[in-house]
């Protein structure tokens, strides 16, 4: 394979990741809309997007794996392919979490509508911001965006402990409380996956594993 052809193949890999990012962005946007409006007609579209993301991620893995096997790329190109495969995998897992959220609401349709507690409303917004900045770091090759995403506080909240305590005190509808706990866990997982994407992007750009750096080193 000539260098020009190989470069074109690398560009196609990045384009596939970009397509996957677009699909996951749509899936999260619809999931956020579903949470805010509790309009269950949105669930079917989220299911379709999850299936689309699964197919795109599978194509990406096959494409990148074939390039590694056939071309035996040099370090920089190998790093790009491996990172792109990892990012694709994390993106597909985000689609899974969006699907999980939609299914939770569908399962609890008789309990809807609900007023989400402030902690969950904050998680919805912060998760969106983390996902946007993490994916932009990969596309724009921006280590500053990667650092900003990695440096954000964890999305872990006191939702679980708060509502388990209220359930024990019989001070809340247990079905609704369990829904709050489950939704918060899914949002937390999306935030964790977004941080993983940012870490992969940082490694792609700087060639350093972020987990091996002390926090102050992120800003040097």
Please name every model-derived segment.
Residues 1-220:
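Cytosolic, long alpha-helical scaffolding segments
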């Amino acid at each position: 394979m000539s260098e020009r052809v190989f470069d074109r193949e690398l560009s196609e890999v990045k384009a596939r990741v970009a397509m996957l990012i677009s699909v996951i962005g749509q899936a999260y946007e619809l999931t956020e809309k579903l949470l805010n409006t509790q309009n269950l007609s949105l669930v079917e579209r989220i299911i379709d997007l999850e299936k689309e993301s699964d197919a795109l991620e599978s194509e990406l893995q096959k494409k990148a794996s074939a390039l590694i096997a056939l071309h035996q790329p040099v370090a920089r190109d190998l790093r790009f392919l491996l990172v792109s495969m990892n990012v694709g995998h994390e993106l597909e897992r985000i689609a899974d979490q969006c699907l999980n959220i939609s299914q939770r609401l569908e399962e609890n349709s008789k309990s809807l509508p609900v007023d989400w507690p402030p902690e969950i409303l904050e998680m919805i917004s912060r998760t969106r911001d983390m996902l946007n900045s993490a994916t932009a770091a990969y596309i724009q090759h921006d280590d500053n965006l990667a650092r900003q995403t990695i440096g954000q506080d964890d999305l872990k909240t006191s939702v679980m402990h708060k509502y388990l305590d209220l359930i024990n005190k019989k001070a809340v509808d247990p079905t609704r409380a369990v829904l709050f706990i489950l939704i918060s866990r899914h949002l937390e997982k999306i935030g964790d996956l977004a941080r993983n994407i940012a870490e992969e992007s940082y490694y792609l750009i700087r060639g350093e594993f972020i987990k091996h750096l002390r926090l102050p080193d992120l800003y040097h």
